[in-house]
């Protein structure tokens, strides 16, 4: 039987661009793992993407995953927009380069190994796991500010 995993992710940025952080919670049954990290000069969207990428990369074998994100950019990007971007050679409908192409490619690759359902949740609306993922992302921002360099925990 294929493992089923719930993943809750969030990204945060102090300034946009500015120091940023990402956080994720991976849950399989009663087991949970928290991961987080940050970068000194980034954007909120990059941190939202990186949270999902790092969570999916942590999985050692193919799983059925439900990824919960409060980022419509991530949810719509991976489930709707990416198909057109790829068909147009990573260009938008307006023929502009896709922003964060490097991370979209990485997310596409990481997600391709799994059966993923993308779930959007309203941020800062009392969703317990989303609030926890936000705390992890803010931990990443704080660590970057203290160390002045990229971090992971």
Swiss-Prot record:
SUPFAM superfamilies: Ribonuclease H-like. InterPro entries: RNase_H, RNaseH-like_sf, RNaseH_domain, RNaseH_sf, RNaseHI. Belongs to the RNase H family. GO terms for biological process: DNA replication, removal of RNA primer. The lineage of its organism: Bacteria, Pseudomonadati, Pseudomonadota, Betaproteobacteria, Rhodocyclales. This is Ribonuclease H. It comes from Aromatoleum aromaticum (strain DSM 19018 / LMG 30748 / EbN1). The keyword Protease does not apply. Keywords: Cytoplasm, Endonuclease, Hydrolase, Magnesium, Metal-binding, Nuclease. Endonuclease that specifically degrades the RNA of RNA-DNA hybrids. PANTHER family: RIBONUCLEASE H1. Mg(2+) 2 binds at residues 10, 134. NCBIfam families: PRK00203.1. Monomer. It catalyses: Endonucleolytic cleavage to 5'-phosphomonoester. It is found in: Cytoplasm. Pfam families: RNase_H. GO terms for cellular component: cytoplasm. The keyword Hydrolase applies. It is an enzyme of class 3 (hydrolase). Its cofactor is Mg(2+). Residues 1-142 form the RNase H type-1 domain. Its EC number is 3.1.26.4.
